[in-house]
Every structure is written in structure tokens, then in C-alpha cells.
Amino acid sequence: MASLHDVARLAGVSKSTVSRVINDEYGVKEATKQKVRQAVAECGYVPNQVAKDLKEESSAIIVQDKTGKVLFVKEGALEQDEIAKVIELIKQNI
């Protein structure tokens, strides 16, 4: 699995530049954006959502049911009654 470092090395830019391009932030020339996007495509880089959530101090619930199906629910995405269902699912799998 490709890392941010791999993309930066291939594009010939810093990791922070790669991050700015991926997050669509300002201050990056169009030619540099194209190099980074090409490197992302070549490497098959996929941003790590869990790492991003940790940096943003966001949280989620990750549950695997008895069949092996994984449920990933981001904080704020559920109503109170749905949270109760997720908690019940967790209890059933303990």
C-alpha cells in the first residue's frame, strides 16, 4: 500500500505539498497539482480515513458482526435510536 511519502517522492515534492493537493487547499501551482495527481494515480495511493479522523479528533464506531461484515459509522452520522441498535449489535458480538 502506497504512503504519502511514496507519492511525494514520485512527484518530487514534499509530503505537505501532497497533503495540500489531496485536501484541495490553496497555494499549490496547477503544474504541481498535476504532478501530485499523476503520482497518486501511479502509486494507487488511498488516504487513510482513520488517520485523518484521528488528526481531526473525530471519532467513529467500528463493528464487525458474526458474519464478518464490518460496519463503520462516523460520529454524528446516527440518530439516538440508531446508536442504540449499534450498541445492541456490539453486545451480541461480545
Curated annotation (Swiss-Prot):
CDD domains: HTH_LacI. Residues 4-23 bind DNA. Residues 1-56 form the HTH lacI-type domain. Keywords: DNA-binding, Repressor, Transcription, Transcription regulation. GO terms for molecular function: DNA-binding transcription factor activity; transcription cis-regulatory region binding. Pfam families: LacI, YtfJ_HI0045. InterPro entries: HTH_LacI, Lambda_DNA-bd_dom_sf, YtfJ_HI0045. Gene3D superfamilies: lambda repressor-like DNA-binding domains. The keyword Repressor applies. SMART domains: HTH_LACI. Repressor for the scr operon. Binds D-fructose as an inducer. This is Sucrose operon repressor. It comes from Vibrio alginolyticus.
